[in-house]
Amino acid sequence: MGFCGDEPFTVWHNDSGDFSKCFEDSVVMTLPAIYLLIFGMKRLYYLENKKPDLFTLKQLSQDFQTWRKTLQLEVIVSILLVAWKILFFIVIVSIYNKPFEILYSVVTVVQWTVSLGLVYLEMKKGQSRSWEIRLYWVFAFFVATVKLRTLTLAIAGKSIYNVGFLEYFSYFVGYCLILILSITSVLFFDNLESYQNLEENEISKEVNANLFSRLTFWWINSVLVKGHKKALEISDVPTLGEIDQSILLSEKFEKAWEEQLKKPNPSLPWALAKAFGPHFYIAALFKIIQDLLIFVGPTLLKRVLGFVESRDGSQDTYDGLIYALLYFLAPVVQSLLLHQYFHRCYRVGMWLRSAVVTAVYKKALKTSLREGTTIGEIVNLMSVDAQKFMDLCPYLHMIWSAPLQLAISLVLLYRILNASVFAGLGIMLVMIPINLAISNLAKKRQTISMKLKDRRTKAVNEVLNGIKVIKLYSWEQSFMDHVNEIRNKELDVMKAIKYIQGFSLLLWSMSPVFVSVSTFTVYILTGQVLSATQAFPALSLFNVMQFPINMLPSVVSSIIEASVSVARLQKFLLKKDLDPNVVEHHINEPGIAVKIDNATLEWEPNKPILHDINLTIKKGELVAIVGQVGSGKSSIVSSLVGDLDKTKGTVAVNGSVALVSQQAWIQNATLKNNILFAKELNQDKYQSVVQACCLEPDIKILPGGDQTEIGEKGINLSGGQKQRVSIARAVYNNADIYIFDDPLSAVDAHVGKAIFKNVLSNQDGILCNKTRILVTHAVHYLPYVDRIILMKDGRIVEEGDFNTLIEAGSHFTELMSHDEQQQQLQQQQAPDKSSDSNEQIGGGDNKESENNEEQNEEEEGENENLLEKVLRKSRSRSPSPSSNRNIDGDDIASGSILQTTRTPEEDEQDERELMEDIDIDGGENIQTPLQKGEKSSVLKQPLRLLKKLPTSINKKLNNSGSGVSLKPITTVNAKPQDKNKIISVETKQEGKVSFKIYLSYFKAIGVLLATCIIGFYVLTQLLSILANWWISIWTNSYGGNGNGSGSGSISLSSSSTVEDNEKAKYYLSIYVAFSCGTIAATFLRSFSMVFGSIKGSKLFHEKMFKAVILSPMSFFDTTPIGRILNRFSKDQLTIDESIARTLGMFLNTFCQVVGSIIVIAWVSPFIILAMVPVGALFYFIQKYYLNSSRELTRLEGVSRSPIYAHFSETLAGVTTIRAFKDVARFVTENERLLDENQKCYYINISSNRWLAIRLEFLGACLVSCAVLYTVLARSRIEAGTAGLVITYALAITGNMNWMVRMSCDLENSVVSIERIQEYCLLPSEAPLFNDKSVPMSWPSHGKIVFKNLWLTYREGLDPVLRGINCTIEPKTKVGIVGRTGAGKSSLTQALFRLVEPLRGTIEIDGIDITELGLNPLRSRMAIIPQDPVLFAGSVRYNLDPFDQYDDHEIWEAIENAHLLKAIKDLDGGLDAMVQDGGDNFSVGQRQLLVIGRALLKKANIIVLDEASSSIDIASDALIQETIRTKFADCTVLTIAHRLGTIADSDKIMVLDKGELIEYDSPSELLKNQDSIYYSLVKASESKQNIDNDDESN
């Protein structure tokens, strides 16, 4: 007896058409056991090795009663089922003895026992029910149904097998138990883990969704309902589950990537596959089954048409009804499987993006940006390249799925059309090498395209970072040309790629036409008759082939693009990290904080910047590092925080490090949070730090106090305020070692001394017991430090304390002598002191005068009295023609102070205000923290001199914050009512995308071209319909000649006439003509769309960039750079690559749907009755979905901007972040922002699946109705007509689905146009040019007249300049001073028209500047800003972007800027490249280059905003001399932090709260002891004297 007993092993029983009993029991019934063996063992291994969770069944609260009861039911049913299966086994063994029957019974008992074991373990470990068990129960139920059917037929006597009642009853009871388990698995599901990490209101419904809900995406209904009722907000979107969160995904990827890094050739794709592959591979199972179900329709079509042709009643109507039912069930199951596949793939794509973005972010924090990767490139890696991965994932399986579908199609076609199918196969084989060649061409250009995208993004980023300088220099046009030049190159390459892709797509999309034409031609020419049962199933298969054929080139193209992105990402991730061991963190020698031993360090390989450095710093020591510009001071700092590569020696620090960079790094956060820097608040410590850093007065006048939001890069703080916040952050950090990289250069002299005393000094400084390293150019601090390190050419040339170095002479003496030389140069016209001046100054208070005299005697030869120096310098100059004029031009008796009637109360109030805030720049005050009981000797003297100050300078600070240099001009989405906030919240449009947005795209393409494109799509569909309609006529013309049985084809009989043959050729020729017309129309539509999309992309980018660069400064002050970059990267990418493709697919499907409706209505009007309600439901579902999808897309776009903003902010402060060892916090914030963005994307893609399933369900209903109609009307309809109806019904299902989805995708994509259009319509500054012309020599004199000038930054804020009236005569040198919010910067902005006047005018050489275009105004003046900005490009480009000057003039300017040697030493000289932001130059060298710009410009009006703050004393002396000589015939306005800088000015302008308080020569102002200028000079001198007293004591 064999395995099957007496029967042979066969699959089918020939008599009944059912499975044979042996095959059913031994194969079909064991399939669930095989599934359980594969997946159950995996789950068993996991459970055995997992520790129990914190909660078990007994620990669950009342909230989990559903889970508890379901679990109890499942356990009880599983036990009963195992017991019953054992009983069933006994029954089977007692009745049967065949091996396959015994095997079946044993396998059944074992598999259910294993299932029970898994259920028990999951309960014991506190785990949610696994998908492996749930799917097993559902699978087992369906398989058990097959067995039950067999037994039911047998017991009913309709089978050849005999079944007893006992066997049937025992099986039926087991079947009912399986049914219970499958129902619980489908309807009940609680994910216990979700309750551990999330609040109840944050939990996504998906977490606890049952199987039915997951299959149909019912769980997303709650979000869609909310979105239908109102515009969704970010808070309405559920939080990502733990499996989707960036932190977990990053850990998985890092683990896989670390394994790859151990290999000789690390592979990023393999790392991603290792981390996320399993989930992706499981999706392939769904795809395989779905691919097989695709062919149910064509197979059934042949049977349906055969049924229609069998009018003789040989086939029962019941068979036709079964066909109609199958036409409904197969697409529904296919849809459920397809969208589970898509959902998994999209989810994996989202995971890949999270992992890649996080990896790039972390890598940027670990590598040096001097390695050659620009910020623009890194932004593209995060936006464009990561997006390529995400876009590819859903279609990557088509690489094997498409060939599989094509192979099955060809096999089925062969069965229908015999060997003629090989003609079509030959066409396809010919296309493969052609498309491979095309793909290679596309790949090469894709690499170039990505590089150009990087260059463009980098250029735009540079423009945004340097926009203020660009506007001040009127360089907008130059940078527009520069960016547009790169963009045009990018578009040229993109155009080539699109034409290549268009040609490839044309070949593939037309291949079904080629295949059908060639196949039918060969079929007819071989003498065959084409019947309806052959033609329409064949056409249906050709339609099936169309999708994989269309998708294959797109997927190949996407793979090519992704491979380019992989290479770029892999190259970046493989960049060398900064060596974490370059700085050792342990020093064996006790009492040593820093030790550098014989170290040579470099920024770039083989280009050392520091040579043989030997440096030892003791704990608690205060060390100053000095030297000329480019000597290596900042490089020493960089070496201590690990930014430099070490080629030899050792660098070691013992303890934590806090860094204050030379250029202050400020976060977009509140002032308080900037200081705390995520440290826990200690109020007393915080207050003392704020006081020590002289920030208290600033906090008092900020609109929100220390809760005021600081804009991006500290936009609403002055340079001094930013630097003091930076110092406060470091001090609060409580580190062991503090490194100050010349931060005091940004503050005025007396505030710098106050900070030095309060923070750094060995006597009273908060950090007196800490190790302090101070890089400085201010030599007056050097006597008070423990040790001085002198750098020159990257080497330490001298070292010691102040006195030792002075006695030793050499380099240090030379450095100190420069200060004296500078003073002597300024004193050449007045070598002697003025006794008159001394008497005048001394007339204030006798006691204080005596003290000052004693101090001056002690300091004689070391420190000159600043008041005397100012008087001497001012007296030495010729008196200005207007020196005795009033501000308005009228004579007044008391110099230039505006007198008003005052009361004693006002005087007292003024004294209190001045005690708190005597300031001459953006917030620099002289208040110092005093110990309890300490006398305020610091402020006593100046206060006594200021008792009679006028009331006009001491008005109370208003609540609007106008006393602070906030510049929130009204801009897009600004919220002026919130005065604590500077950065506007990015909002989104709500509701349906306006038709104007679509119209703007068509206008960008060109109305005529857009009309032609639409016409070509209509023509293509019309010709396609005519071809199919002709097939229907063709097949109907043969009447009953077709073989209705569907056995294949019939040959022409011997009686066939030549006429019949000619008739077939006639029909074939017309069909070929229509097909050729379709090909031609497709060609025209494809290439016209490419041409139009390129034209539209170019126009949108140009308009947006022009609108952005011409926007007022207020826009940039309130808009983060990351938000703007988002428009230029992701949104522009959507217009470049997505919209045209999506629009084309929508137009195509729309034409197909309309065409199908026309054909169906024409052939069978009755089906319209079914189409009306189905169409209505289509519309309702689409509208219901679109309300939410549209808002989710907008939210996804809005939430993407903070990622880029955070990234840009991080890169700007990466050195500080690394020094503070705070990398982990910033990584966590990046992950949080990424998750906020991804949750919108995830819900959006899930809603897409929700939509598709419902639309395809309606489509299945429509097809079923069409088949039902043909079945019921077979007596009145021809087979060819029926084939046409069903073919178009099948087509309209998919097409209507795709049309709705493409319309939704199109609207979602058009959101990018909406966002770009928003920027295209930004309000602009005044035009660069207008009708008003001025001579080329204007301004020839440089006379400036302010007439009643009022200025406000935006409507609703108080004016920042109030009635300024004064005249600056030609060639006058004016020093501008004032305290916080005085209006100094506002005056400069008004002069350059960065802000337009509220009222009043400014005239230059008699011309009202508001009548001029901005270009002639700004380009005829020169400004040297405090923050030097350089752009990537050559040195020549940075000095002369318009190529206006020859090499001789440029070299002369460089020489006068004292940078000649540094530039000549560069490879390439003037053509040497400047890195992003000038990173390959020191800050001082950057400042000198900026001075070179002004020298090259040769303007008659020069504005200096602390032009030499970052320059050493020696260079400063030379620069000051250059300014005096080269700008001698110019009008010069100098905003001063150091009073010495303006001591020799012709006039001093004192501003306070927007009012001009004093305007006269320094000598005249110093004669009046009540003048503010006198008090400032005296205060500075007093502070210096007190410091000297403290030192001597």
From Swiss-Prot:
Residues covered by the ABC transmembrane type-1 domain: 280-561, 1010-1308
A GO CC annotation given for this chain: membrane
Annotated region (Disordered), positions in chain: 816-938
Biased composition (Acidic residues): 851-865, 905-922
Pfam family, one: TMD0_ABC
Bias type Low complexity, positions: 877-886
Residues in ABC transporter domain copies: 594-818, 1344-1578
Membrane association type: Multi-pass membrane protein
CDD domains on file: ABC_6TM_MRP1_2_3_6_D1_like, ABC_6TM_MRP1_2_3_6_D2_like, ABCC_MRP_domain1, ABCC_MRP_domain2
Localization terms from the record: Membrane
Positions annotated to bind ATP: 627-634, 1378-1385
Molecular function GO terms recorded: ABC-type transporter activity; ATP binding; ATP hydrolysis activity; ATPase-coupled transmembrane transporter activity
Membrane-spanning segments: 27-47, 75-95, 100-120, 135-155, 169-189, 280-300, 318-338, 392-412, 419-439, 505-525, 1005-1025, 1064-1084, 1157-1177, 1251-1271, 1280-1300
Domain of life: Eukaryota
Family per similarity comment: Belongs to the ABC transporter superfamily. ABCC family. Conjugate transporter (TC 3.A.1.208) subfamily.
Protein name, UniProt field: ABC transporter C family member 8
Organism: Dictyostelium discoideum
